[in-house]
């Protein structure tokens, strides 16, 4: 360990007992490797392999026109440099992509009209632009329209053949109906299935079913061939009145004789009636030399004839293949003198007559009828002809354009059916179909097993590259049609490839995929862990996958093959449970898309260091021991019997039979679960919540790595890209808050710059509005090794993931404030900003060109006081650093409005004052309700050709200065390095020429050289030719580097000064970023790492919190009743170990203070060596040791890896070492009375997270606001600034109270009585508090609805009704 490192690193005490052999793969490798393989940006020697983008082009090209007079061929593709880099794309809201150029060759043929022979007439090659291809950033994400997105990998059913049954659900008898399904990568599905009558049917693409024999006829077999393919035959020979049948012991094994079996030759009984033919009997019969048995006519009846019996002379068919032998048929065959009868070997026990029965019910008997049937099923209503039917059948399964099994499908099919076709054979063959039907019939006969579709050998992963490949292929196929049409319609001799191609469909397919595919998701950027997890997610949903509604229980369940491949813990709660999974820590995806996990090889009971990655299919045949199996020093397995897994079963075997062993105990779980210490002591449901809630932890203002970690923290911080790792070794040259400059000391390649500049992100907004800010960890002059962490990011500390804070917890009730998982906090937590986070909100405003004239961004806004404009500059845009509150103006904007007719008063005012301000209205951007914060950034975008305002110019100047500084620093280091090398070459030489004033043949020394300006050193000429060429090469390279630097600077400046690409109609756009500081408050959700979540109920003054004897107050009080029923005991063990860590920290702190006081290192070294293992402190100098001690003053960090961590005894040892009680319980005193509580309380440090569910984002109040158009009721929800719903049950409550007037105003003036609510408002303004409720608008809606149904409903008041009744008096004689 380098001494320099200690200053920016904490040494963790490691509890793991099991040595890990395999290196954990990079956590975002899944994404990067897949996309790199798809793009293959750099063309290797000898051209690109046929995969990824290359294979897409190869599969679509060449394209020929309809007359085959021209051919458009694909030659190669190249990518140009992207127009903007990642940061520029983020800022400008554009897609990070590189232009794709494809070289195409157009060949035009001359066709001889008589012979039809072709000769090449003309060949033209051209590079064609095919749209932009999005590039992946270094962190495995894509920038689409300025936002970071992730393409989630999809789990789908592997192509190949699957055998299954309906579990007895289809038929009432509960009979198992077997089915086989051939699933291609693309093309028609083929199902072969049994029905309840044991007839075998076939379906194509889930359409109507046909007898399987029709498919076999279509493949070119006839009835006899079908039977001979599926059945063996037995020849019966006439022997007097009886028949002779060959004796075959294998065939008759297990056969129970109903009558005596008699040897046909000797006539003796070889097996008596009622006995079973077992292996011993069979052997004895064989030894006697029995070749034939005697069979009576009765034995033949019910058997089936194996081939057509034909009278050779007349051609008359006596019996057809497959006919059942009846007494009548047997007699007629005897009559014509048939002496040998070939019979199908069907015994109805081991071999069933299914195919023969199917053949019997099939009305087709020849190829033509079968093809017609298939055609009618696939294209109902079209009249078939033999040609169309043949072409259609061929295109279904045998045409590589339409049908593709893929390499995976072929490999799976070969494995399942014991075939040996090469994996380049991507279409179906006749043999494949026959093998499938055979295997299915064998299943029905009880041979073989059905497949488990949830086995990970039958599910594969489609990552970014493959998803993108399929999408791009679709785009190219759309394009192909257009190209063909265009080739036929233009004069082919004069056009170039460019004129034939319209790349829009291809570009649109890519855009559609990244913009709106279900698998292209807005990246979860809450914290570094959520980013990593999102990139490692596996979804069974999405196009070509399952849907939530259809997915059953089995698909969602944990399967034995998930071990080490998919995490059994981390999955969402709710409707997606089990459909969205996470890749396990050591898992990787192989070239076929199957998930592999590593194992160590075990040879003769000795564990080797050889690591093998195996997929679920390969693993099935081995005995696999667990990572914690007992071993001695020589790595020999010590147990008499070792617990192993094999093919999903757990068994015990002798050590010498073990083949493999797990590489690590944590290979079973995902990254998030591997971050939970004492995971093994938590219930699975709570572990699931713990994994999921860590992803919602908000980055805090001060990150604090956990006292009790698992050792995974550094890995996540590094691989997520949150913390910055050094790209090359070197020396730190400059450091400030926004960038680090490192001089690469080991760079030998002269073409690469000798300097690395790392830009740190400062207060950038993440996708979830959390704050991304990085801070340097290195000092000037420090040496840095490649891969070392040089800057911390959000939620990282000293290069370790730090999602929350270590707080002092007491497990005890406190006045009911921690009832039902509520959390009681101390005021110290708020005062010291322990759980304070910064959130950055983004607001944007656009100035458009409207019909009435352009909108304008300005400070000059009508009817706004100077006070309201105090934060705006002269351009009308808010200053950086201004503190703003709800309702404040951020950007002043005015919009022209149409001339409205003026009232006389207005005309008078106009005449007097000449006021012209009335024709614009104020449409400024204001701070929305509930937001208060500080402006941290403002960005101004202008359209091309629109003059930039003051503010835009200032921002541009600042940016150019920054770029110039970067260029100057690189130039300085380049100069320093080059001239140092030049001086080394020149010193000691005697040049024959030099700068002005140099006397030749003087031997150069450093003093002489330094008299001349550095730029003149190149003028020295030495005699040695070799050295002279070296100097010239050095100068050339120096000039080139200088030129490159300047060019890069000018390009960036040009991009800055160029206008921005804005949406149509937008002249100018301003984005304002407001940083909001959120302290913790009641209503915020917090959680530990063990699924122990709760809501803050109260924040108590520090003096009222329970305290220890030494006066230390608890920070947080949790309810002890939250532990037993939830069974997440890990939190208690974590608390104990955290308590020990803090105690040890106090001891180390005293020793460090003693060292600083009297410079005696011995006590500190003794203290540190007692805590850490010798390897952890190896090679530390005294200063480094003191620095390491200083870093652990607050607590000695521990690492307890999952399933391999601290045991109870280890925790007790640590507690004793820290001088604490072994029970980790302490006497606590009540903060309010000062009296001790009557029993000891568990107290210690627990790692708590503040989750993204903040009360500030949810709380909301409205007085007046927007109303729904139709019902006129207030809208709902915070986003719409809506009201509170007063629903049916609330109405019942008021009815129950008898609060009639309150109820009336709730349902009228406070809701949708339009006239009434206006009157109430006016009354309140007048200071009057009486009002009258009118008719709610929803009543009018109801009346309109009824009228639309043809019911004439009218609303009349009771007074009008009375008047109407009075008018209609009954006539006097009505009573008579």
From Swiss-Prot:
It catalyses: RNA(n) + a ribonucleoside 5'-triphosphate = RNA(n+1) + diphosphate. Its EC number is 2.7.7.6. It holds the Pfam family RNA_pol_Rpb2_1. The RNAP catalytic core consists of 2 alpha, 1 beta, 1 beta' and 1 omega subunit. When a sigma factor is associated with the core the holoenzyme is formed, which can initiate transcription. SUPFAM superfamilies: beta and beta-prime subunits of DNA dependent RNA-polymerase (SSF64484). One of its GO terms (biological process) is DNA-templated transcription. It comes from Methylorubrum extorquens (strain PA1) (Methylobacterium extorquens). It is an enzyme of class 2 (transferase). GO terms for cellular component: DNA-directed RNA polymerase complex. Keywords: DNA-directed RNA polymerase, Nucleotidyltransferase, Transcription, Transferase. One of its GO terms (molecular function) is DNA binding. The keyword Mitochondrion does not apply. DNA-dependent RNA polymerase catalyzes the transcription of DNA into RNA using the four ribonucleoside triphosphates as substrates. This is DNA-directed RNA polymerase subunit beta. Belongs to the RNA polymerase beta chain family.
